[in-house]
Amino acid sequence: MDARFTAEQEEIRRTLRELLLKRCGPEDLRAAVLTPAGYDPALWEALARQLGLPGLALPEVYGGVGCSVTELALACEESGRSLAPSPLLATAVLGAPLVLALGAEAQRAELLPRLASGELTAALAVPGAVLATALGLVGDNGGDWAGGGRAGGVQARQVDGVWRLYGQAAQVLDGHSAGLLVVAAHTGGFARSRTLLYLVRDGSAGLVRVRQTSLDETRPQARIELRDVEAELLGDEDADVAGALAGVGDMAAAVLAAEAVGAADRALERTVEYVRQREQFGRAIGSFQAVKHRLADVYVEVQAARSAAYYAAWAAGTDAATATATATGTGTGGERVGGLALAQALEALRRAAGEGIQLHGGIGFTWEHDAHLYFKRAAGDESLFGPVHRLRGYAAEVARLFDRKGDGSRAEVTV
């Protein structure tokens, strides 16, 4: 891994930071989350048309920019700094990569250019509030999670050659406003059951979408009800859905880690700015050793999380771009570290946001102050994509850290 950024990568960061400083300040953010869509359409158009963010990591042949996961992670790190509400995560990180990975050529040619331009937004609908499981981050994504068990789920069946979906999914990121839903559904009955992905278009008969109240208002979520809705199978029935979801999940975890690092970094910056100005006992409270040590610990944690996020993005991008990475020795050999990076980044964000609230004193606990927005982002993301101990536990399980040899000793593991 080359830790140096190219001039193009630095330009992406600089341009996006300048735009978000102008267009997504605290007042803009609070106004955007109150709109029906949950984000500012004008800002989304600027991100899509001027900067090409939705298509940043999509191939040029489908209207994308042709960059790697690293560029997408850097862009999301900047959006995380401002907590910018937008369909970028749902569209560019979850929806479009699945269409690219599993879609038939006709589906790719129709949908990816529209997704890359920002004209069309997408959302991944997973039943049972098990998004992290479906993405292979905290458990077996080859299991029967789409069926939902007693909690319901989404069932798919063919009627006269047409796929129809029944069921519901909750906590769907941007599900209330997306023009395209990628729905995970259970099909084939219990003897031959499997999970496939289906495309549901906006305005389909029987589709009911309701925006839910969420802990983090900058991450709008929805409940999706499918009442005999006509759907289109994504790809074919032999598609490796579990493998595609796990691949997208690792990439998404790396990007989310970078976004969390951006939020943590900005929360720390704001706190440092405040303790330099706030005076007590005739001097700035930032001059007190106890305050310095707390902020120094946060700084170390944020920088460590940043390194982990960058490495995870590089690893995900290398494996996605080079099919022969293992054979040539130029890639990571199929190494998936996104979940570990996300766990470290979420911890750093939670620590930075929590210390920010405490060191701001009474004002940090008020609704009018922005400190709670960062804490809600940390808690909301951990609820959706974690929790942290499960991210680490599953990574240890995959790496076989707890396996023993025949003599009872631990298996040798390369980390």
Functional labels for PLM-detected ranges:
Residues M1-G80, R114, G118, D250-V415:
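Alpha-helical interface subdomain recognition
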Residues S86-A106:
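N-terminal glycine-rich flavin-associated loop
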Residues L102-A122:
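FAD-binding glycine-rich core of flavoenzymes that anchor FAD
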Residues L111-P113, L135-W145, G153-Q155, A169-L173, ...:
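A generic local secondary-structure boundary/capping motif
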Residues L120, R150-G152, V159, S177-G179, ...:
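A generic structural signal for well-ordered coil/turn residues at beta-strand boundaries
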Residues A125, Q168-L207:
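A short core secondary-structure module
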Residues G128-D160, G188-G189, T318-G333, K405-A411:
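Intrinsically disordered, low-complexity terminal tails and inter-domain linkers enriched
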Residues L135-G143, Q171-D174, R201-D236:
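Flexible, small-/acidic-enriched active-site or ligand-binding loops
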